[in-house]
């Protein structure tokens, strides 16, 4: 991973946070603090925490939420910062959908559409996931997802939210 410091004037982005190993509430709160202390990142808003069933093999339920950031980092350096924070909280990347101490996903970056080998913006599965859309709609209902052209409030109406409950 490069220690790129590529910057932009200022951008608004949305991230998803999740945890299902360890003291998830403490981990997620500490991750928000770590984000806010990251150079080039300002925490603007955060959702409440939601409990959801895990996707994939049997494992503990997740605690999920979303945050809005104002950043002066471009997308790739921001992703690298998110990955460093995950690693600092003990995240070990194994198989897909495995349990994790901390998962930070870059969902949206202004109206950018980006597809590189290491990063896709918008996040490729965000429009299918109630555990992302419910907390995101709480803090950014009018944000337009650039591929569908729909607001987050519209997108959340297209998924089954019955398994997403306030923690």
Q: Where are the regions that the model predicts?
A:
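Generic preference for hydrophobic/aromatic residues in regular secondary structure cores
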Residues: 1, 7, 162-166
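N-terminal beta1-alpha1 ligand-phosphate binding loop
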Residues: 2-41, 46-51
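Flexible, gly/pro- and Lys/Arg-enriched active-site loops
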Residues: 40, 44-47, 52-63, 73-79, ...
């Amino acid at each position: 991973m490069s220690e790129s410091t590529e910057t932009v004037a200022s951008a608004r982005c949305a991230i998803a946070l999740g945890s299902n190993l360890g003291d998830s509430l403490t981990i997620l709160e500490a991750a928000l603090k770590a984000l806010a202390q990251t150079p080039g990142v300002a925490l603007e808003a955060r959702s409440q925490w939601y409990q959801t069933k895990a996707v994939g093999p049997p494992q503990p339920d997740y605690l999920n939420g979303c945050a809005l950031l104002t950043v002066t980092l471009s997308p790739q350096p921001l992703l690298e910062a998110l990955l460093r924070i995950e690693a600092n909280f003990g995240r070990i990347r194994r198989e897909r959908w495995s349990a994790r101490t901390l998962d930070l996903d870059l969902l949206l970056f202004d109206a950018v559409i980006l597809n590189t080998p290491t990063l896709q913006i918008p996040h490729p599965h965000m429009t299918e996931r109630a555990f992302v859309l419910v907390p995101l709609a709480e803090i950014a209902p009018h944000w337009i997802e650039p591929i569908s052209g729909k607001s987050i409030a519209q997108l959340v109406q297209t998924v089954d939210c019955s398994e997403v409950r306030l923690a």
